[in-house]
UniProtKB/Swiss-Prot annotation:
Belongs to the terpene synthase family. Tpsc subfamily. This is Copalyl diphosphate synthase 2, chloroplastic. Pathway: Secondary metabolite biosynthesis; terpenoid biosynthesis. Substrate binds at K82. One of its GO terms (cellular component) is chloroplast. Keywords: Chloroplast, Isomerase, Magnesium, Metal-binding, Plastid. Involved in the biosynthesis of ent-kaurene diterpenoids natural products such as oridonin, miltiradiene, eriocalyxin B and nezukol, known to exhibit antitumor, anti-inflammatory and antibacterial activities. Catalyzes the conversion of (2E,6E,10E)-geranylgeranyl diphosphate (GGPP) to (+)-copalyl diphosphate ((+)-CPP). It comes from Isodon rubescens (Rabdosia rubescens). Ubiquitous expression in roots, stems, leaves and flowers. One of its GO terms (molecular function) is copalyl diphosphate synthase activity. Pfam families: Terpene_synth. Its cofactor is Mg(2+). It catalyses: (2E,6E,10E)-geranylgeranyl diphosphate = (+)-copalyl diphosphate.
Amino acid sequence: MGIRLLKMHGYDVDPNALKHFKQEDGKFSCYGGQMIESASPIYNLYRASQLRFPGEEILEEATKFAYNFLQEKIANNQIQEKWVISEHLIDEIKLGLKMPWYATLPRVEAAYYLQYYAGTGDVWIGKTFYRMPEISNDTYKELAVLDFNRCQAQHQFEWIYMQEWYQSSSVKAFGISKKELLLAYFLAAATIFEPERTQERIMWAKTQIVSRMIKSFLSKENTLSLEQKTTLLIDFGHDINGLNKINSVEKGNGLAGTLLTTFQQLLEEFDRYTTHQLKNAWSQWFVKLQQGEGDGGADAELLANTLNICAGHIAFNEDILSHRDYTTLSSLTTKICQRLTQIQDKKILEIKDGSIKDKELEEEMQALVKLVLEENGGGIDRNIKQTFLSVFKTFYYCAYHHAETTDAHIFKVLFEPVV
């Protein structure tokens, strides 16, 4: 886990250090020559090996070994452990195998971790031998529970507001259900959960819903003719204020006025400079929509740009948007999320040995993770890069999990208090 933690915080770590734990028969072991291999070290190996960059073959080998080892032990009811006595260890391992790192969201992971964290109810040999009170600590657990429930209360308050917005903006008239709104807000809250980031969460959810409202409006046969739709998209791409032309094109259509009002309110929640930046982001999206690329990748690009703008990462420094690192991240995120959207629509995500079978997609995801996590002097701010990773992971999450699993996560993160 030390390798994983260091990599996640930007340190240059050679994963070949794991070769010291690889035996001649290709298996990995905490100590060579053991009669019984414990589950917890192999589970930690599995968690660490998922965070890999292109070309790190030792981590790919470790992932396959650890995944198959743990699956076999669970199937045969042979989970054995000599380092810790924990009632929930097997539950934690089962969850980790079902929900790999790419398919986790921060608050989902936290909710389950708190569920399985037993505090002093767990017995660690290392804690007893070396007097490490910070391990399995009841005080830490109490603090974590209070923090989680405080954030959850804030999220519930915001969800009430989002439902009011849904009604006042007549979102249902565009064929968008309240459950879709809940999913959009959940993805935001499970990713950027801190209480002080309300504006970013709300903007995340609204951006996803408003973009769907626009696409729904343009796809309705009884709203505009094909020629009018084409003209409208061109106007949007060149001048976001061209949205007013909806009224002149189709004054008698009630949806047009509703859409116009909702879109303008979305942009007017910010100061003039931020609004200008948001208009530019939407203009790019409208151009993609005109070119028939308005799903998946373009949505991810719009969302990432919007979040970076709203968080103030680009304030008074629009040159960042044309920085080589930013454009590379944006292009790669767009390409990956476009593919993930296609996978989600067709339900064709195939998993083998804990990894997806689409090797090209997997390599692109590894490249994105490397660009985000590795420090490169003179590059863009780490928070900006992290935004692209956060957006990508929500797309992977939606492609990976079934609706029933997502519903369970929504309830656990937003509505079930931790005790």
